[in-house]
UniProtKB/Swiss-Prot annotation:
Metal-binding as UniProt keyword: no
Xref: SUPFAM superfamilies: FAD/NAD(P)-binding domain, Thioredoxin-like
One cellular component term from this protein's GO annotations in UniProt: cytosol
Binding-site residues, NAD(+): 357-371
Disulfide bonds: C345-C348
Listed name of the protein: Alkyl hydroperoxide reductase subunit F
Additional information: The active site is a redox-active disulfide bond.
Source organism of this protein record: Salmonella typhimurium (strain LT2 / SGSC1412 / ATCC 700720)
Key words of the record: Disulfide bond, FAD, Flavoprotein, NAD, NADP, Oxidoreductase, Redox-active center
Length: 521
């Protein structure tokens, strides 16, 4: 199961264990059970602190295994294979169960230990999903820390019957005590806040006590991270606030055009950005979104950022780097069937539609790449492009046209998502040449029609263009003195990671120049 290199790395990690770990497998006669048994036996051979045993009498999913301590039943459970992107989740679960501390803030760990109530979480994942590990790891950690919290991470490919019964059409999909809890990427802080209902109020009260910053950066993607590093290096009081560190990068799989880094993955780059920021004196505020900008009443005064949690943060200068999100089709049925067949991540959710018919909306690079990827998994792909021709690179167009199970429809305006009340069953589109309406029967719709800037919260506060992008000049200055902007949320052309980081650095330098030239009001 594990090659020599993986065994060497895992053996080194297991040396960090400070207390014994027991792997308890519940298996059947399936090939997947044999695979898991082999994997667990290999892991146990790598450390004298790890033991493996079978107990096939337990009333749990088969195949599955519990990671616990001898004499205990507390800890995370994996149902199915924890390989692919989830192998890291397995390694971390072993470390945490074996006494190696988590790197999360101590205050957050104590909050988890103090959660009152019984919670049984179930998370469905796919081995190709790059968004799933964050959720699986967060809930695994909670199960290690609090005996009243249980978590089972379930491989959707192994338990396809449950995927069908529960209408899971997007991963990660989380259930708690048998009811839907959430879908898509969630941070540990976000999950804890949903479980601990008083957490948001306490967080807002704590934020309100923060002193004013010299520069407050709103958005923790590449632009925000670069701005934070450049600002902190100037020795000024720097705050960095965001919903999730890494931003849109977290939803990117392969990155091959970030100069000096020939190839990496979105999660790895986001982790590197976070590690770089942590090297400096930056007050990082996670899982917080801005709801309003209140510009300073006088030049040199304090600007205010109101958060969705009800807090108010103040700063002499602001850098807005809130990035962008996937653009919606804005047609009937899209909202109703979101995560029930309407999805935005082919890498995460593609395996859930194995052997089914799907559509991809959009003929740009993202859409054509999605169609190519999906063609190897699903029965058939229908690619719909609004314009008379696709806008993807020619090499991608040539590739997708060579695939026998992909149909391309141009001049197609999607008009409605069709469903049966619980899941997608098809879509309708209008031929923009003839005006005729056509129906396509399918199970999934992958929307790939570009990005929308995350600037809705700035309505009336500063100038934006008709696309919602913040209008900036060559120095990243906005229409409000002391407020700067950088990255995908601005009018800067070409939405690229490397451009966003450069713009973040530029915005930071401009903000510093503003601070040293402006008297404090």
């Amino acid at each position: 199961m594990l090659d020599t290199n993986m065994k060497t790395q895992l053996r080194a990690y297991l040396e960090k264990l400070t207390k014994p770990v027991e792997l308890i497998a519940t298996l059947d006669d399936s090939a997947k059970s044999a695979e898991i048994k082999e994997l667990l036996a290999e892991i146990a051979e790598l450390s004298d602190k790890v033991t493996f045993k079978e107990d096939n009498t337990l009333p749990v999913r088969k195949p599955s295994f519990l990671i616990t301590n001898p004499g205990s039943q507390q800890g995370p459970r994996f149902a199915g294979s924890p390989l692919g992107h989830e192998f890291t989740s397995l390694v971390l679960a072993l470390l945490w169960t074996g006494g190696h501390p988590s790197k999360e803030a101590q205050s957050l760990l104590e909050q988890i230990r103090d959660i009152d109530g019984d919670f049984e979480f179930e998370t469905y994942y796919s081995l190709s999903c790059h968004n799933c590990p964050d959720v699986v790891q967060a809930l695994n950690l909670m199960a290690v820390l609090n005996p009243r919290i249980k978590h089972t991470a379930i491989d959707g490919g192994t338990f396809q019957n449950e995927i069908t019964e529960r209408n899971v059409m997007g991963v990660p999909a989380v259930f708690v005590n048998g009811k839907e809890f959430g879908q898509g990427r969630m941070t540990l802080t976000e999950i804890v806040a949903k479980v601990d209902t008083g957490a948001e109020k306490r967080a807002a009260e704590a934020l309100n006590k923060r002193d004013a910053y010299d520069v407050l950066i709103v958005g923790s993607g590449p632009a925000g991270a670069a701005a934070a590093v450049y600002s902190a290096r100037k020795g000024i009081r720097t705050g960095l606030m965001g919903e999730r560190f890494g931003g849109q990068v977290l939803d990117t799989v392969d990155i091959e055009n970030y100069i000096s880094v020939p190839k990496t993955e979105g999660q790895k780059l986001a982790g590197a950005l976070k590690a770089h920021v942590s090297d400096y004196d930056v007050d990082v505020i996670d899982s917080q979104s801005a709801s309003k900008l209140v510009p300073a009443a006088t030049e040199g005064g304090l600007h205010q950022i109101e958060t969705a949690s009800g807090a108010v943060l103040k700063a002499r200068s602001i850098i807005i780097a809130t990035g962008a999100k996937w653009r919606n089709m804005n047609v009937p049925g899209e909202d109703q069937y979101r995560t029930k067949g309407v999805t935005y991540c082919p890498h995460c959710d593609g395996p859930l539609f194995k052997g089914k018919r799907v559509a991809v909306i959009g003929g740009g690079n993202s859409g054509v790449e999605a169609a190519i990827d999906l063609a190897g998994i699903v029965e058939h792909v229908t690619l719909l492009e609004f314009a008379p021709e696709m806008k993807a690179d020619q090499v991608l167009q040539d590739k997708v046209r060579s695939l026998k199970n992909v149909d391309i429809i141009l001049n197609a305006q999607t008009t409605e998502v069709k469903g049966d009340g619980s899941k997608v069953v098809g879509l309708e589109y209008r031929d923009r040449v003839s005006g005729d309406i056509h129906s396509v029967a399918l199970a999934g719709i992958f929307v790939q029609i570009g990005l929308l800037p995350n600037t809705h919260w700035l309505e009336g506060a500063l100038e934006r263009n008709r696309m919602g992008e913040i209008i900036i000049d060559a120095k990243c200055e906005t229409s409000v003195k002391g407020v700067f902007a950088a990255g995908d949320c601005t009018t800067v052309p070409y939405k690229q990671i490397i451009i966003a980081t450069g713009e973040g650095a530029k915005a930071s330098l401009s903000a510093f120049d503003y601070l040293i030239r402006t008297k404090i009001a």
